[in-house]
Amino acid sequence: MAAPVARGECSEAALAAALADVPELARLLELDPYLKPFALDFQRRYKKFNETLNNIGENEGGIDKFSRGYESFGVHRCADGGLYCKEWAPGAEGVFLTGDFNDWNPFSYPYKKLDYGKWELYIPPKQNKSQLVPHGSKLKVVIRSKSGEILYRISPWAKYVTREGENVNYDWTHWDPEHPYKFKHSRPKKPRGVRIYESHVGISSYEGKIASYKHFTYNVLPRIKDLGYNCIQMMAIMEHAYYASFGYQITSFFAASSRYGTPEELKELVDTAHSMGITVLLDVVHSHASKNSEDGLNMFDGTDSCYFHSGPRGNHDLWDSRLFIYSSWEVLRFLLSNIRWWLEEYGFDGFRFDGVTSMLYHHHGMGQAFSGDYHEYFGLQVDEDALIYLMLANHLVHTLYPNSITIAEDVSGMPALCSPISQGGVGFDYRLAMAIPDKWIQLLKEFKDEDWNMGNIVYTLTNRRYLEKCIAYAESHDQALVGDKTLAFWLMDAEMYTNMSVLTPFTPVIDRGIQLHKMIRLITHALGGEGYLNFMGNEFGHPEWLDFPRKGNNESYHYARRQFHLTDDDLLRYKFLNNFDRDMNKLEERCGWLSAPQAFVSEKHEGNKIIAFERAGLVFIFNFHPSKSYTDYRVGTTLPGKFRIVLDTDAAEYGGHQRLDHSTEFFSQPFKHNERPCSLLVYIPNRVGLILQNVDMPN
């Protein structure tokens, strides 16, 4: 009799079966041998994914048809001018359509009950063939629950919802314009290295109000293009009743937020970005939903289990929101159709999936430290229904548009999250490197500059699995929110309000802040990943935190804005940080370090506070020492020949001290140093980041 296999082990026969079932599992295990004991988990996940895909094929005609739910569910104009309506409300006793078209008579247009909890209604056109429910009409679905309660609801498939005056709840507005927006530009090519500008339309104006899609299109997109970003991540687009939720309490999943304008204006924004060569990603929230019932998904059919788990499992205690039941056939249809809707109707080029950690585990990541022990990523704590949904979503996105981009926000470090589905992975293109901003905040908050640990910085910036692509960032919207601080605020604090004028001498605080702000962002950009992200305004050290209007601040918009005009004022030092960000991005576009293999770090010297590495044929040198500069400092390189400075944080246009002569040529010699065959001598002043390029390199 064979010996029993302990948890965390895998018999040879079981491993062989897993390798036979998962086409490229061998490649995954070759890249990460520590995953070998969990081969059966990958086998089970992959088989379950294929079973679900095959079931969709047998029962729905394939995922292509299945993901077009928005073409039949909701309300649609027919060729004859009539209206076809369809809903899924398994807990309802009766379903009706009402609105201003029938003077809000709740029961005059009943739906017909179909199988599997579906209901449909056909409303013929008027005798003159005109529409009974014209564009802009207000509508409601009326639900008669099994207990006899009459509920007024917005269709989960509503394409546009609006709130007028002092109304607390949103209204469903029928969106069927006579002249819908026609896209003029094709999608841009997939960037070889993504440089993402994390954006929020509503806060994009310096005025104390909610900005519009049009404002963003005509005033912010040109700035993004000028700064050298090739991708924008649009936050808070899916409709959310509570503005201060930052777009993370979704009420209408198919509706573009009306507080910024119309659906056609959002399409113009995306199309204009495409004309500039900018890829557009949507921040998609499928990890949870708002608890709102009158203008949300919650209790749509009068039960708590329509789209969500019933009972405690259906509630996220920390977020005070509802949790989807990913094993439900109709929930899968709803979510996959939602993904496709944003790709096809609005022209988005991919997604950043929010709250993936919460989806992956039954514990939702709450109270979990995630030590990196691989047993934390497998077993009963994993919500495999949610995992299969994410695999299906990635499969759909990359099948429809192979050049699309998907990014996972996962703090746990789930292995194979960004591996191909054929390897047993989940299929994301990138994951967010969420430990990096925490490290910078920790250093600024807890350590003196002279106590910064160079090895620890390098470890944090390079701690990623081989061939698992990461989006690096020094800070995102999370650090900008009230209760936290941006890097600029940690560095310069209150002096940002008094000492940013070029007419006044540098104070020690402002000098330190401006120099370290550039260095932190450059080393994160160059060493931290295969993509880079910045939250709007942080590139120039935006002087205030972010706080949306709410009761606690008397509904003030003062901190819910971005003061881009500060960079346009020649008398303020914000322009220096803005200039640096632009040139850093444009140099990456030219040299392509984000798409190059991971850097070779040749030096992390604790006493000298020096970090040196090579990537994409460039030599990066950072001197984090607060006071020591070094002449003739030897730095290793693989390349012989002549080098020149191509980026210098100490340059005058970046608010530096101009201590380096850019006409200087550096010659490497065949003198081995720090495991490099060649080396060169450089002058590296304190608090300076430097990039050298071999003059014989093609770029």
UniProtKB/Swiss-Prot annotation:
Annotated GO biological process: glycogen biosynthetic process
Modified sites of kind Phosphotyrosine: 170
Any Pfam family matching the protein: Alpha-amylase
Taxonomic superkingdom: Eukaryota
Pathway(s) the chain acts in: Glycan biosynthesis; glycogen biosynthesis
InterPro entries tied to this protein: A-amylase/branching_C (IPR006048), Branching_enzy (IPR037439), Glyco_hydro_13_cat_dom (IPR006047), Glyco_hydro_13_N (IPR004193), Glyco_hydro_b (IPR013780), Glycoside_hydrolase_SF (IPR017853), Ig-like_fold (IPR013783), Ig_E-set (IPR014756)
This protein's record includes keyword Phosphoprotein: yes
CDD domains, alphabetized: AmyAc_bac_euk_BE (cd11321), E_set_GBE_euk_N (cd02854)
SMART domains: Aamy
Annotated (1,4-alpha-D-glucosyl)n binding sites: 104, 140
Domain observations: Binds its carbohydrate substrate close to the active site, but also via regions close to the N-terminus; this may result in increased affinity and therefore increased catalytic efficiency.
Protein name (database record): 1,4-alpha-glucan-branching enzyme
Organism in which the protein naturally occurs: Felis catus
Name of the encoding gene: GBE1
